[in-house]
């Protein structure tokens, strides 16, 4: 792209963005800076030959961390340095739900948000600490969340909400903002990824307020990761070693081959995402042999370091272009990820944590796992059943009939026992009775127009069912 056209595009964009009164001056300048970086064609690819596997000093094995201090006073002092931040910008639309994803019921009538609040309440009660909860909303979830958090008014935790940035979608043809062309509804805008957490925390005034209260670290996680509970060993390690940033990573399985990984690159620890990998090395990137770990998006970051880097405008994370279409108009969303910020912080590390700290619920197949006898809930934490000897969870594949939460729940009188299950595939018009037990490899595929009802109390082990006759 010729520089002149890039310059013209940018000046046209600036004058259009200046007229968008729905967003703040901070958001306008943040957006213009992001687009300018994108147009300058900053190199996104890495030089493959410079990639090194991180050592145990850089990616610390969890089992080498020092034990948590014994005394409850020491633990209280540790916890009083902590803030928990949940990324709450996503909607439950992919699972057929309206409103924020965090209000989907996970188990025992409790939502993601209920479980998070119970966990922190439990910590604060046990140790007399004051760990606040921050929710970073997007413009899509803000209004609903404000109403939802009222139900926690009587809890012993402070709950704060703030909004991540709101940026205009760019029309690909002329590089002008969609809202300035009359799309003033929500479709004209987008939240620019969780990388915007850092400036948003600062612009909201929350960052300075937390620092003035003596808070030192923020533990950030997706609100749908049920494994992301406060870990005192990790917090203790970071405080003792003055690490400004920590990313929790965990060993890859074949399901995670596209996940970002940590590398050592030119003397710093860096996140490597599949989008940055040159085409000829994508196969190598996906191999579990060379890149053994992936990013859980559980992050621990020092608050003063965030302040220093935001004020210096130093957090220039890799830009992720996300093309979309709105009513036939091709648009572009430029996004950044919080994990990519790792290379800007001093003494940044990864910690290789057990898989139990990564339990995301992205689809109803995940919901089946966490609602089953594979897990129990204790003090808001989802604990895996020790009766399951296989460290990996069964693979679950559910057809489109189960995609929406309401349909999924309607098709199970009760969630089957799956402690001894290896894999399950269910497609078509299938209904489950109560007390069903599934073991080994089970496939239930109802052909079009055929209804399959699994009777109450059925035990199905290593079986393929293609119709009622197979039961």
From Swiss-Prot:
Gene3D superfamilies recorded? Hexapeptide repeat proteins (2.160.10.10), Spore Coat Polysaccharide Biosynthesis Protein SpsA, Chain A (3.90.550.10)
Main location group: cytoplasm
Gene Ontology biological process: UDP-alpha-D-glucose metabolic process
Q: Name one Pfam family in it.
A: UDPGP
User: What compartments host this protein?
Assistant: Cytoplasm
| Keyword Repressor included in the entry's annotation | no
Q: Which family does it belong to?
A: Belongs to the UDPGP type 1 family.
What's this protein's name?
Answer: UTP--glucose-1-phosphate uridylyltransferase
The species this protein was found in: Astragalus penduliflorus
